Amino acid sequence: VIGLDLSPHMLVVAQEKAKQAGLAVQFVHGNAMETGFPEASFDVVTASLLFHETPPDVARTILLEAFRLLTSGGQVVILDGNQRTLRGTEWLNNIFEEPYIQEYAQGSVDAWLGAAGFAAVKTEDFWWIHQISRGLKPLSTQRVAQNENKTSLEEIFAEAGNPQVVFQ
């Protein structure tokens, strides 16, 4: 598991939380738009409360990088503010005082995921203030052919090794 953040302070906070929880996490200072990690090196990429703090074009660039980082069949999972709730409650946008929250609220994480190449895109409400969005990097035709004779998901995942997660 690798945690990535642009903020050195948040990396220190995350390291302390991981230590207290007894988790072995490698934390890296870096930019989610250009991580420097090799292509297809992660099975899962997550982003938590990131996109409402970025301009939409930056969010789209980050999603393109997530797509690049994922193996075929890999999944991106995004937890962020509920866009539908934010669109319907202007007062809530004013409370957060985030410079890009209005643009985020008017956008669509689903559309951004689709434009980045993700399939099976789905967003679900998580309570009334958050949403969880998911997308899958489509399987390559070669990987589909390799998996045709497998009888269970366990067989497919056994070959994947140890999945890694990037927290942005």
How would you describe each model-predicted region?
Residues V1-E34, T61:
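Class I SAM-dependent methyltransferase SAM/SAH-binding core
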Residues G3, D43, I78:
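Conserved SAM-binding loop
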Residues L23, A40, A116:
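Structured loop/turn residues at beta-strand edges in well-structured enzyme cores
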Residues M33-V45:
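A short acidic, Gly/Pro-enriched loop at the edge of an enzyme's catalytic core
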Residues D43-D57:
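A short SAM/SAH-binding and catalytic strip from SAM-dependent methyltransferases
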Residues R60, Q75-R134:
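C-terminal alpha-helical "lid/dimerization" subdomain adjacent to the S-adenosyl-L-methionine
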Residues R60-S72:
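A short glycine-rich, Lys/Arg-flanked "PGG" loop and its adjoining helix->strand segment in the class I
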